[in-house]
Amino acid sequence: MNYIDLLKTSAKKTNNCACMGLDPIFEAIPNKTGMLKDNLVSFFKELFDTMHEKNLVPAAFKPNIGYYSALDKPREKDFSGSESLAEILSLIEKHFPGIPVILDSKRGDIARSSLNYAIEAFDGWKADAVTVSPYMGSDSILPFISEKYLDKGAYILNRTSNPGAKDFQNLKTDSEGKNNSELYIEVAKKIAFYAKEFPGTGAVVGATGMEELKIISGIYAQAGEVPMLIPGVGSQGGDAKTVMEVLKNSGCNLALIRINSSSALTHPWKKAPVPENYLELCINNIEKLLSETAINGISF
């Protein structure tokens, strides 16, 4: 089964195109044990147990590796963050079999270095897909999508959800005025080109720029099967219902879309003290996202 098939199968299984981001801030997680690793793992186990009981299953999970590696202290032989992520991934396999894991690491380097990062993601972490920066060009991207990793997914940063995205991504590509398209449009065209030869090549497109999303989703709808990972829903201000409407109007295959929300699902209280009903708050937001990203009646 290649990554396109995995996306379609998991969308059909869950009846949604939601992605649950797993980006824990240690200070915002209930402190029941006093131990970093035990706290993180026990929190996600409790959350996953409840989701499983209520049959709340998103169509993907996306841990951002930076939130875990930042908790490691390698020089002190302390790998609590990485060990936590390993156990959390095992919990996902147990509770939600067949649901893809997207390792959000935004890698991209010269060819051999990118191959090492691909090995890290796919052989080390056993991820199904990874996020990749396109800035260094094709030789930095191809190790993630060709040869031994043809059945994996790679989401290339296209038009991201952060405020600074416009600094580079919206720049005009031709100062002579012959071609006035923004850089993100040219990146989208290149991603569509890669996707024809390497199935599983996808794009990261933020939920915070609707005009850009309309343009990009139109490009991918015409290109064929191009997966999209759409972060920015929830705390960053993006709205899942609006995103779904744009995607439907563009003609995109919703089975290949994953709309991501992270902190709004795992610690919606943000910097406030952890409330007693923390689990209920998380579950309510998860239910809301799954409902807003439901894909009833689509063709797989």
Where do the language-model regions lie?
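Conserved, mostly hydrophobic/aromatic
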Residues: 20, 61, 104, 130, ...
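Conserved anion-binding
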Residues: 25-26, 31, 109-204
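Conserved N-terminal beta1-alpha1 strand-loop-helix module at the mouth
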Residues: 1-63, 68-98, 274, 280-298
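Acidic (Asp/Glu)-rich catalytic clusters
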Residues: 11-13, 48-57, 87-96, 144-151, ...
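C-terminal helical cap(s) of enzyme catalytic domains, especially alpha/beta-barrels
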Residues: 243-252, 256, 265-300
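A C-terminal functional module that forms or caps the active site or interfaces directly
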Residues: 208-260, 264-268
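Active-site-adjacent beta->alpha loops and helix N-cap segments on the catalytic face
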Residues: 70-91, 110-114, 135-150, 208-219, ...
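Short, well-ordered coil/turn segments that N-cap beta-strands
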Residues: 14-18, 56-59, 97-99, 126-128, ...
